[in-house]
């Protein structure tokens, strides 16, 4: 920087120049730490990926202890695999799942090699019975995400020619899903044979997640191909599922797709239901359809009312709202990340700290933890390298920039390397009390666990453009052309949609910088980011005659009540 030598300006110029050289020591330390941890996560990913490619590819997943493979996509639905072709080698699920992670790590060479191999070798014309939900989030989602990354010129991932090969594979797979939706209710079967459709005497039982978490992938497929059947089928199923909710706006865990009757009445944010909530919100962000927001808002309020107990979330009967099971499940650890997206930062932080406390207690997160007894569930002591806690840690750091979350990520990286890393990859933990290992490296370890830990320490990928991540961690870029109704204000880091009534102003959390009641724009302080659970009092002066005129608090998500002197507030203790 050159300065004009002028007596009156010399001092000011020196001050300006010095600002370019003064560095906050704590900030510098954080950046050094982030860089070091990023490289450690990179090493983790490639240790898992290279061993898969060496010992398991093109089969589905790696067995790291024996350095062999499992064709898990088919084995999920086939206890006996005699009917499979003798030359069946799986569907390269781990490769499909790894493509978006390779893109985020900037490995264009390996990304292009993977795309080329899949284009020339992958086929779904196989006599294999697969789980619709798992195949959708892992394979269909992986192909769609990789296709979108491949055609984005900013990524420069493909040096040769790319002619939508991954999209054609995704379209073929999507068409093979459609027979599953041919039920009296429109709710899809949980299992589908990729070659022959729904098998005779197929089970009619499925989960809420299984039929309510398909709309992101199938909706994106319709937008990309112009074929409306995929999104229509997924949306019809989702709406039917929502019509089956109780008067409390709660849904059970399992149901019958033919009769439309509930089988398991226990409702929760955990296994069997978790991604239902996630996809309602993310579908609203991705497609802008108001129905998604209305469903999510009602479901979210109900979850806060009937499941929340301090920082924990127990299960409750969908009809009565009374608690059923007081247990933490590892899949629930996604919830703080979802709360970040709707702006409930305080609640997200509170729950996240409790999950991490359990992680610290055992070294990893057990599958089920009994809250009332503070012990591990006797038959569910395993940890299959799940990503949900890493995912929420990433979101909370993005929202707060609190370096404590970097410490959490560092602790997780150390634990994974200490307890689960073996010469042949990363192994699941069979029993967290003994750290006995299991011979399985799930594909989601590369698709999600490593990805979210990497993004925690290096967010340059999400800083460039708006993405939502599917429940399997596959990024899909948010583009205005996919919105039914464009936001009134659109800009690169976020978007705002102004409305009338109780929802006077709201912002989706695409920039991951959302907190309740923080001004969107310093020039327009009346525009504020509200949490999803925030419902305004009917009167602007907060006066009331009854509880019906009071709303829901934005920070705690608690119902406000009318006091004896006629004002709405948080008068009742927890």
UniProtKB/Swiss-Prot annotation:
Glycosylated residues in this chain: 89, 107, 121, 201, 349, 494
Gene3D superfamilies named among the record's database cross-references: 1.50.10.10
UniProt entry keywords in alphabetical sequence: Endoplasmic reticulum, Glycoprotein, Hydrolase, Membrane, Metal-binding, Signal-anchor, Transmembrane, Transmembrane helix
Cofactor(s) required, per the database record: Ca(2+)
Top-level taxon: Eukaryota
InterPro entries on file: 6hp_glycosidase-like_sf (IPR012341), EDEM1/2/3 (IPR044674), Glyco_hydro_47 (IPR001382), Seven-hairpin_glycosidases (IPR036026)
GO MF annotation, one: calcium ion binding
Cellular component GO terms, alphabetical: endoplasmic reticulum; endoplasmic reticulum membrane; endoplasmic reticulum quality control compartment
Keyword Membrane: yes
Main location: endoplasmic reticulum
Keyword Hydrolase tagged: yes
Annotated positions binding Ca(2+): 471
Cytoplasmic side: 1-9
Membrane topology category: Single-pass type II membrane protein
Function description: Can convert Man(9)GlcNAc(2) and Man(8)GlcNAc(2) into N-glycans with a terminal alpha-1,6-linked Man residue in the C-branch. Functions in the formation of unique N-glycan structures that are specifically recognized by components of the endoplasmic reticulum-associated degradation (ERAD) machinery, which leads to the degradation of misfolded glycoproteins. Most likely generates N-glycan signal on misfolded glycoproteins that is subsequently recognized by OS9. Required for ERAD of the heavily glycosylated and misfolded BRI1 variants BRI1-5 and BRI1-9.
Membership in a protein family: Belongs to the glycosyl hydrolase 47 family.
Name under which the protein is recorded: Alpha-mannosidase I MNS5
Gene transcribed to yield this protein: MNS5
């Amino acid at each position: 920087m050159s300065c004009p030598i002028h007596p009156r300006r010399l001092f000011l110029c020196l001050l300006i120049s010095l600002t370019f050289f003064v560095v906050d020591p704590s900030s510098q330390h954080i950046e050094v730490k982030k860089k070091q941890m990023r490289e450690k996560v990179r090493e983790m990913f490639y240790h898992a990926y290279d061993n898969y490619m060496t010992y398991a590819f093109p089969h589905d997943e790696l067995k790291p202890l024996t350095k062999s493979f499992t064709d898990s996509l088919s084995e999920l639905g086939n206890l006996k695999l005699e009917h499979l072709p003798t030359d069946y080698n799986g569907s390269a699920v781990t490769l499909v799942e790894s493509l978006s992670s390779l893109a985020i790590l900037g490995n264009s060479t390996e990304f292009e090699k993977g795309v080329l191999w899949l284009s020339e070798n992958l086929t779904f014309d196989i006599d294999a019975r697969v789980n619709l939900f798992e195949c959708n989030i892992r394979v269909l989602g992986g192909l769609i995400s990789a296709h979108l990354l491949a055609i984005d010129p900013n990524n420069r991932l493909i040096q040769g020619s790319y002619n939508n090969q991954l999209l054609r594979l995704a379209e073929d797979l999507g068409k093979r899903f459609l027979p599953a939706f041919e039920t009296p209710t429109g709710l899809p079967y949980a299992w589908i044979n990729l070659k022959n459709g729904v098998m005779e005497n197929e089970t009619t039982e499925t989960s809420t997640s299984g039929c309510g978490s398909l709309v992101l992938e199938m909706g994106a497929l319709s937008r990309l191909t112009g074929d409306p059947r995929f999104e229509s089928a997924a949306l019809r199923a989702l709406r039917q599922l929502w019509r089956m909710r109780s008067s409390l706006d709660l849904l059970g865990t399992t149901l019958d797709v033919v009769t439309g009757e509930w089988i398991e009445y226990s409702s929760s944010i955990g296994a069997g239901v978790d991604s239902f909530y996630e996809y309602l919100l993310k579908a609203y962000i991705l497609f802008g359809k108001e129905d998604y927001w209305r469903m999510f808002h009602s479901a979210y309020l109900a979850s806060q009312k009937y499941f929340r107990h301090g920082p924990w979330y127990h299960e409750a009967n969908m009809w009565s709202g009374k608690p059923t099971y007081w247990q933490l499940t590892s899949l629930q650890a996604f919830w703080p990340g979802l709360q970040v997206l709707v702006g409930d930062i305080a609640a997200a932080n509170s729950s996240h700290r409790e999950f991490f406390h359990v992680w610290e207690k055992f070294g990893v997160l057990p599958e089920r933890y009994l809250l009332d007894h503070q012990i591990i569930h006797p038959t569910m002591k395993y940890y299959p390298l799940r990503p949900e806690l890493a995912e929420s840690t990433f979101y909370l750091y993005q929202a707060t920039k609190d370096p404590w979350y970097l410490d959490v990520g560092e602790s997780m990286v150390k634990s994974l390397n200490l307890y689960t890393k073996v010469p042949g990859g990363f192994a699941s933990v069979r029993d967290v009390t003994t750290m006995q290992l299991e011979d399985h490296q799930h594909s989601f370890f590369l698709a999600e666990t490593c990805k979210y830990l990497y993004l925690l320490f290096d967010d340059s990928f999400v800083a460039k453009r708006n993405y939502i991540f599917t429940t399997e961690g596959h990024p899909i870029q948010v583009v205005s052309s996919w919105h039914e109704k464009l936001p009134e204000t659109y800009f690169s880091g976020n978007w705002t949609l102004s409305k009338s009534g109780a929802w006077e102003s709201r912002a989706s959390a695409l920039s991951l910088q959302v907190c309740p009641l923080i001004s969107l724009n310093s020039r327009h302080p009346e525009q504020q980011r509200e949490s999803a659970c925030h419902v305004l009092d009917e009167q602007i002066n907060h006066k009331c005659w009854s509880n019906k005129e009071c709303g829901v608090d934005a920070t705690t998500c608690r119902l406000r009540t009318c006091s004896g002197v006629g004002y709405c507030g948080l008068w009742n203790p927890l």
